[in-house]
Amino acid sequence: MATNVKKVKKLRPKNVTVGIAHIHSSHQNTIISFTDKQGNVISWASSGSIGFKGTKKKTAYAATLATAAAAQKAREHGMREVIVELKGTGQGKEAARKQIITSGLNILLTKDVTPVPHNGTRPPRKWFKRQEKR
């Protein structure tokens, strides 16, 4: 019996010279995605996709390796300059930004787009208990 073999298309380089690096650093993980100016994802990586599990995903070292992997893919697509958008309060935010520089990409602008409530809704009860212990 013959089996059907799927043909896998090889991705062509997109030739994007200027893009945006979105770095989302939470308390558990760091997600990095490189997009073009319109927001189409060119490459991405996270601490979990690199192979880290559990509490090791939130470390700055894991964010560094994830950024290096995503930046390498972005450079293969022709990206040379990036605008960095940082979001979140995790450990890997600054480590990821520094890794972008060492991976050979020029940073044009750095923005912190962390959402900050202007006295929005009341936080849940468990938040108050945590604040009292500090």
UniProtKB/Swiss-Prot annotation:
Bias-annotated ranges (Basic residues): 123-134
PROSITE patterns assigned: RIBOSOMAL_S11
Pfam families: Ribosomal_S11
Any one Gene Ontology molecular-function term assigned to this protein's record: rRNA binding
SUPFAM superfamilies: Translational machinery components
Keyword Ribosomal protein among record annotations: yes
InterPro entries: Ribosomal_uS11, Ribosomal_uS11_bac-type, Ribosomal_uS11_CS, Ribosomal_uS11_sf
Single GO biological process annotation from the record: translation
UniProt keyword list: Ribonucleoprotein, Ribosomal protein, RNA-binding, rRNA-binding
A single Gene Ontology CC term: ribosome
Residue ranges, annotated region (Disordered): 114-134
PANTHER family with a match to the protein in the record: 40S RIBOSOMAL PROTEIN S14/30S RIBOSOMAL PROTEIN S11 (PTHR11759)
Family: Belongs to the universal ribosomal protein uS11 family.
General function of this protein: Located on the platform of the 30S subunit, it bridges several disparate RNA helices of the 16S rRNA. Forms part of the Shine-Dalgarno cleft in the 70S ribosome.
NCBIfam families from the UniProt entry: PRK05309.1 (NF003698), uS11_bact (TIGR03632)
Subunit structure of this chain's protein: Part of the 30S ribosomal subunit. Interacts with proteins S7 and S18. Binds to IF-3.
Protein name as it appears in the record: Small ribosomal subunit protein uS11
Organism: Mesomycoplasma hyopneumoniae (strain 7448) (Mycoplasma hyopneumoniae)
The organism's taxonomic lineage, starting at the top: Bacteria, Bacillati, Mycoplasmatota, Mycoplasmoidales, Metamycoplasmataceae
